[in-house]
């Protein structure tokens, strides 16, 4: 291996390391990790996502249609009730999967409003 090839390989490795560390806002969890002291778990987590989604929708101006809004709220509530059920299953299961997800980001770690809104169902103008 020539010196220039070796230098290129080291530079590429450093670039990958910098890129990976700059995206460090993503949380990872181990299956045996305990909840963060400021983490939100279970039903309060689903309620926090619901509040964050409603805030995001109001900041974006909502759907603008009253008829479509009722259908949109039903869809959002169905999504959030599914999220609550999933959170309860995750709390009850002793063998939780490791990795990333809302439980990892907001229960096992402390998440912010921006991270909560990543879990909002998509809002479309034509919902209804």
From Swiss-Prot:
Q: Signal peptide span per the entry?
A: 1-24
Record-linked InterPro entries: Insulin-like, Insulin-like_sf, Insulin-rel_pep, Insulin_CS, Insulin_family
Q: Name one GO molecular function term.
A: hormone activity
Which residues are annotated as modified residue Serine amide in the UniProt record? 127
Q: Which residues carry this modification: 4-carboxyglutamate?
A: 115
Principal localisation: secreted
Supply the Pfam families for this chain: Insulin
Extract the SMART domains matched here. Answer: IlGF
Keywords of this protein's UniProt record, alphabetized? Amidation, Carbohydrate metabolism, Cleavage on pair of basic residues, Disulfide bond, Gamma-carboxyglutamic acid, Glucose metabolism, Hormone, Secreted, Signal, Toxin
- Give me the Gene Ontology terms describing cellular component: extracellular region
Point out the coiled-coil segments of this chain. Answer: none
Per the record, the similarity remark reads:
Belongs to the insulin family.
**What does the protein in this record do?**
This venom insulin facilitates prey capture by rapidly inducing hypoglycemic shock. Intraperitoneal injection of this peptide into zebrafish lowers blood glucose with the same potency than human insulin. In vivo, when applied to water, this peptide reduces overall locomotor activity of zebrafish larvae, observed as a significant decrease in the percentage of time spent swimming and movement frequency.
Instruction: Name the chain's protein.
Output: Con-Ins F2b
Q: Origin organism of this chain?
A: Conus floridulus
